[in-house]
Amino acid sequence: MSTQYDSDSSPAASNSGSADPALAELAQQWQSLADQVRHHREVYYYGNPEISDAEFDALLTRLQEFENSHPEAVTGPSPTTEVAPSPPESSPFRNVDHQEPMLSLDNVFDTEQLSSWLDRTPAKTYLTELKIDGASINLLYRNGVLELALTRGDGTTGEDITHNARTLSDIPARLQPSEDFPVPEIVEIRGEVFIRVEDFAKMNAQRQAEGQKMFANPRNAAAGAMRQKDPAETARRPLRLICHGIGAREGFTPASQHAAYEALAAWGLPVSPYTKQVHSAKEVLEQVAYWADHRHDADHEMDGLVIKVDDTESQQRLGTTSRAPRWAIAYKYPPEEARTRLHDIRLGIGRTGRATPYAVMEPKYVAGSTVTMATLHNPSEAHRKGVRLGDEIMIRKAGEVIPEVLGPVEDARNGAEREFLFSSLCPECGTPLAPARGDDADWRCPNTRYCPGQLHTRLTYIAGRGAFDIDALGEKAAYDLIHSGVLPDETGLFSLTEEDLRRTDAYTTKSGALNKQGETLLTTLAAAKEVDLWRVIVALSIRHVGPTAAKALANHYGSIPDVAAADVETMSTVDGVGPIIAESVRDWFAVSWHQEIVDAWAAAGVRMEQDVTEQPSADAAGSIQADLLAGLSIVVTGTLEDFDRSSAKEAIESRGGKATGSVSKKTDYLVAGAKAGSKLTKAEELGIPVLDEAGFHKLLSEGPGKGDAEED
């Protein structure tokens, strides 16, 4: 299917066997790169990509750089000057020319490149809009009636998919008349067909239930749907349209891109709600930064931000190249999804004994970092996704979120892939794994005290900034303390001596003397004995008890023995605790070896008490409920006096709310501290209630309607 150009007919090729073997070698390198670009561009446009978007972008950039360095090696038409592959002769669809070429966009990949483009392309007003990851379409309306729907094709000629396009509810058969924008005699409308993220998940779930193959991503599903021979199959997919441009037109000349979008909306066509006019290069860069942090606020997948000169006269003056307008550019974000190969599946054991399967993969750059492992969540989920050893798989990593495996690329299988069988034994200690409850999807290791895997994660948690904040006790050092036999559990942590540390590799020199890291550990352990009581409570690793609940318990009871002696009913009334946390505290202290930890730390000098700063009141009973904020989506931004990011999140979630990182129409409250920034601006634009820190405290204690910011 891939278009091939005959390099043997070119001048460079005809001379390759004679005068200049070096030039012939360069020409062969160019031809190989050009063929790869054409092949991958073609399979992408027809919904069957073999590499990720980022890998294709890198391949195209490599070809462009090669041509810039060796122009003499270019032996024929280059894909760097082409929009897309021509429709194949074997296509079941009729090939039709566009009224006006349907060009692509040039890309930039960092703010330095974007700033350079902005310097070359100054404008009073720019338009920024999301780059939708879908399938391009060109709609031709004559006297307001839909006449043709074409794919982009090679930019000059596309495939006639009119019958399929008519099944989309977003594509009107007739444009609505408008007093402000009369319907022109002829107009080409360019847009993107896509599937919303929410609809894609529902569609794939239904396909799985029906035993059908699931789609790898919304873009492939949308592109494939538009090229179905049977329009009824197209109609079964939840396709949507966003219009983002106008091609040929007669009787209509908009003054700006923004005015063109107003006309499209007036005619009954969908336009993006995420488009924004900005008036400087600085504002463009601010939009780029904003959407880098808010990619998931949109209801569709997006892989970049498109920047356009708004003024139509300026667009005409700037003109186009053979493949793209000079007045527009696409800023491409680092990919959040990537394709790689699965080498192995292993089990990791967490702090609470949970066994989490994770994939070991070929290294892949995704969302700004190179990843080699990705979670499969639990054995049931791993089986559901159907991954096999040796599979090519799709992975996703959004920002700082742990990478996850989306599923296998089934079309890439060659029969050499192998089923993976999960061991029923803990990989760390050999204890049989079992669900904590009959309906629990997670497997757990019941050897809580002595399992090296659980102890390792508990030690690093104890040493973390949210607990004792112990320097020189990182993951490698914790591993060494455990596997050298120095610490069979956390009981002896505060009794460690120089002699103990000399039995480890992490804390000794080659001669066996205590090294600087060992000295630092002993110093910080001594200092940690005097930390605030709430940090000690956090370090006990009680389920559901983070900094917020720990502070509430410390302030209310004043000592670890009093916390241990409290009954669930009374503890449930403590502001910031509630019944779920109270039951978890009771269950933790009911385990005999947990009390041994408390006793050993106390004997070693860890402070186990403080002054009581809050007394229970009769009115407190039932005031804090686990569902106080149920159903509410809350965003915290800026700097707060009484909360860091994790404790604010815990305070919301312990009351049944959802703590999210970005503002959208679904956000119920924004809590704004100092230096709140763009999230505050967006919340105000959307009319979302904004709370200061005092209002946040009221919301946490009294629920919605009581902690709202007062109106002027």
Swiss-Prot record:
Domain BRCT: 624-712
NCBIfam families documented for this protein: dnlj (TIGR00575), PRK07956.1 (NF005932)
Name of the molecule in the record: DNA ligase
Requisite cofactors: Mg(2+); Mn(2+)
EC number annotated for this UniProt entry: 6.5.1.2
One GO CC term, this protein: cytosol
Protein family: Belongs to the NAD-dependent DNA ligase family. LigA subfamily.
UniProt keyword terms in alphabetical order: DNA damage, DNA repair, DNA replication, Ligase, Magnesium, Manganese, Metal-binding, NAD, Zinc
Matching CDD domains: BRCT_DNA_ligase_like, LIGANc
Upper classification of the organism: Bacteria, Bacillati, Actinomycetota, Actinomycetes, Mycobacteriales
Active site per the UniProt annotation: 131 (n6-amp-lysine intermediate)
Function: DNA ligase that catalyzes the formation of phosphodiester linkages between 5'-phosphoryl and 3'-hydroxyl groups in double-stranded DNA using NAD as a coenzyme and as the energy source for the reaction. It is essential for DNA replication and repair of damaged DNA.
Molecular functions (GO terms): DNA ligase (NAD+) activity; metal ion binding
Name of the gene this protein is made from: ligA
Enzymatic reactions: NAD(+) + (deoxyribonucleotide)n-3'-hydroxyl + 5'-phospho-(deoxyribonucleotide)m = (deoxyribonucleotide)n+m + AMP + beta-nicotinamide D-nucleotide
